[in-house]
A protein has these predicted regions:
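N-terminal small-domain helix-loop-helix segment of the aminotransferase-like
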Residues: 2-90, 95
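Short acidic capping loops at alpha-helix termini that bridge into adjacent secondary structure
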Residues: 79-83, 104-106, 192, 214-215
């Protein structure tokens, strides 16, 4: 009898479930933060013509640096910060988990939150700690502080606004948690994938106090631009 083709696949990976997308028939679909409108016909034609002239058969070379420079100008990137681009937030989240893959390392996030925080940690063999939100969907500051003190996570995710609860965290609580993580050398990711739905951005806070955010990544997405 031949050996199982799954023998070298970790058991915890085999026990995981696929990332499921719920049907949205008859609903106003906002959960994926997609642009509900198609491009105007004139823009479609111009875009097709422009893309048709791009040497897609070659690696991007300098084009990636040109794109980074344009994006940095667009968002008025604070001094001392740099941009890292990925194929959607999922790739960046996975790369961060890989970068933090040290024995006993932990990734922490409030829950409910974006499923990929936990999934990327588990795929990489890291510990994941989810901290339940308060009854009003606010951050449970005491529980977050206790979990951070206990586990000293390499990486803490704070979605701003949160997905799926749609709220912005209290700024004072955010500042205290960011400072707590920075005190032992941990990293914080402020995930602003849904920022276009929001009245605020943590980028303003970063600009206001750069020194307090030297260990903070701010993540956004163009997948729904």
């Amino acid at each position: 009898m031949p050996a199982s083709p799954l023998r070298f696949i970790r058991q915890d990976i085999q026990s995981m479930h696929a990332y499921a997308i719920q049907a949205s028939d008859g609903m106003v679909k906002l959960d994926a933060m997609e642009n509900p409108f198609t491009l105007p016909a004139a823009l479609q034609a111009a875009l097709g013509q422009r893309l048709g002239a791009v040497a897609v058969n070659r690696y991007p070379g300098q084009r990636i640096e040109d794109l980074k420079q344009a994006l940095a100008q667009h968002i008025d990137l604070p001094p001392g910060y740099a941009l890292m681009l990925g194929n959607g937030s999922d790739e960046l989240i996975a790369l961060l988990a890989m970068a933090c893959d040290m024995p006993g390392a932990t990734i922490l996030a409030p829950e409910p939150g974006f499923v990929m925080y936990a999934m990327s940690a588990r795929l990489q063999g890291l510990n994941f700690v989810g901290v339940p939100l308060a009854a009003n969907f606010a951050l449970d500051e005491a529980a977050m502080q206790a979990a951070i003190a206990l586990h000293q996570p390499a990486l803490v995710y704070l979605a701003y606004p949160n997905n799926p609860t749609a709220n912005l965290w209290d700024a004072q609580v955010m500042r205290r948690l960011i400072a707590q993580v920075g005190a032992y050398g941990g990293l914080v990711v402020v995930d602003e994938a849904y920022q276009p739905f929001s009245s605020g951005t943590w980028l303003d806070e970063i600009r206001r106090d750069l020194s307090a955010h030297s260990h903070v990544f701010l993540m956004r997405t163009l997948s729904k631009f």
